């Protein structure tokens, strides 16, 4: 899970609470090893080079550390809060850096993220789940990930200022729609990842 919250560790992340409440539990109950990474804890340079620290513009770039985690994963879930109806600025930076690696090819000559499964989990206290999911899932597909059915899940409160997911009385953790969709997401990711793994990924023919 790439939790693109704006909150650095150890501050509370409502998005991370949703991750842990449902999808992570489903994965781990079925033998899938998981890891939650907060990109905001790292120095992620702007740009599309593999390592921006090799350019004159940036003295430090932690993105290669995160890219190693992505490379090792079969399933990558971009998780974000909603701000002004959009995914977080951290999520945008993450997707930009992932896009910068599309020129790296696997042994079939495909973009190196072929054969990986992508999905998204979103929280907020305003509208925007479907809008954010539309952008994130397209971006993952364009980069080379395979997106399963119902690969988005999330929770938002009532319109206007109000409690966030993990706040007392929000109703978020008890929301049947959120819990159902998070469960569908986890299972569909596992099923598709297994299908891809068993069949050697996406055929290179054509």
Predicted regions and their residues:
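Amphipathic, positively biased hydrophobic alpha-helical segments used for protein targeting
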Residues: 15, 129, 135, 155, ...
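Short, glycine-/small-residue-rich phosphate/pyrophosphate-handling segment
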Residues: 13, 107-160, 177-180
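N-terminal beta1-alpha1-beta2 submodule of the flavodoxin-like/Rossmannoid cofactor-binding fold
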Residues: 1-108, 169-206
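Conserved catalytic loop of SAM-dependent methyltransferase domains
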Residues: 43, 47, 156-161
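Short helix/strand-capping connector loops at secondary-structure junctions
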Residues: 157-174
């Amino acid at each position: 899970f790439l939790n693109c919250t704006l909150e650095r560790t150890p501050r509370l992340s409502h998005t991370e609470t949703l991750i842990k409440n449902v999808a992570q539990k489903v994965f781990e109950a079925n033998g899938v090893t998981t890891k939650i990474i907060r990109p905001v804890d790292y120095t992620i340079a702007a740009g599309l080079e593999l390592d921006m620290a090799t350019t004159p513009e940036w003295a430090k770039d932690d993105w290669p550390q995160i890219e190693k985690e992505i490379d090792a994963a079969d399933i990558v879930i971009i998780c974000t809060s909603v701000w002004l109806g959009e995914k977080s600025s951290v999520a945008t930076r993450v997707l930009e850096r992932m896009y910068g690696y599309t020129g790296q090819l696997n042994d079939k000559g495909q973009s190196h993220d072929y054969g990986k499964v992508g999905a998204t989990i979103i929280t907020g206290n305003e509208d925007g789940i479907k809008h954010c999911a539309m952008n994130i899932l397209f971006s993952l597909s364009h980069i080379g990930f395979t997106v399963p059915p119902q690969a988005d899940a999330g929770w938002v409160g009532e319109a206007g200022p109000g409690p966030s997911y993990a706040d007392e009385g929000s109703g978020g953790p008890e929301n049947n729609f959120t819990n159902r969709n998070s469960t569908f997401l986890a299972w569909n990711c596992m099923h598709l990842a297994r299908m891809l793994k068993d069949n050697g990924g996406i055929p290179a023919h054509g």
